[in-house]
Structure formats: C-alpha cells, structure tokens
C-alpha cells in the first residue's frame, strides 16, 4: 500500500519547520526531493491542489489546474541535517490558547535591536511574559513542568502556524545555545531561543502608590 502522507520541511540558520501533508493519491516509492522555497512559493496562488511530476533534474508543478512549470531540483546531499529533539527533552502540554497568548505578548516586545532579550517573549513555569521596558504583558499559565525559561522570538513562521499547538519542549545544546520545539497538529517547529537571562519584569509594574 502506497504512502498517503508527505513530509514538507524547510529551514534556515535559526529555525526549522516540517509539515505532514495529506496526499490525494498514494505514492508507491520513497521520494526525497529538494527545491527552492521561494520558487515553489511563487507558484502557489491560493488554496487548492498541487500536482507534482518528478523528473531527473526538475519537478513539474501544477497549481490547482493551472499551467505546468518546471522547477530545478537541488542535491539532497547538500541539504543540512534536520535538527533532532533529544529524548530527555520532555514535552510540556500547552494550554489551548497558548498561540494566541504568544501573539498578544509579541505586541509588547522591544523593537530595539540592541535589546535582544526584550525583543523576545519569555516563557516560564509561571506563564508568558513580554516587556519593552515601558509596557508589560503577562499571563499566568500552568507550565510548572517546564524545566527552564526560554525566550522565544515571535517569527513570521510562528505567526502563520494556525493549526492547534500541542506541546513545548526545551533543551540546551552545548554550553549555551538554547533550543525549543513546538509540536502541533501535523507540524513540528524547532528554533533557537535567545541566550541570556530575562530581566526582572516585575520592575515594570506600577508601584502601589501610583494610580492605575
């Protein structure tokens, strides 16, 4: 019986994203190809079916019954290895609205490129926090099983993950590099966190003598 699921993946130096995509027809052979993401994206004009015909050096792509266009294939051997989530990186189940909370928190981050930590969103065992140093967003969430705080850059890729987010795992690679993985319905997203210790955001709260 041929496979009816394809794995679509892309990565850069800081993040990796893979999707499981349902195929309209089964594929009887193991096929592994690489094309330029920007070229493939330029062919997709909207929601619909994509048809692929794979040749020796090109793949013929037809979007939703439109014209067929050839894309050059790139050597699989030149593709970087996909990151691996360590077995000891225990996933923490995420609240249903976690993606929404992260998006809201990103609105309170700093746009100052010299303040890398404040440009990200801090996720800790007590919840999600972001501050520009002038305003503050914090929502308490039950993430007590999270072993260590992680500061997440809210990238375009994260903003476009509309499927349900299920779990978050964090780990340290080498001495300093922090990484995290978000798994959801049909996808896995892995990226580097922002190194360093997030500032004491409670200092942004107004004092008890100030009017709120």
Annotate each language-model stretch with its function.
Residues 1-212:
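Structural preference for solvent-exposed beta-strand-turn elements
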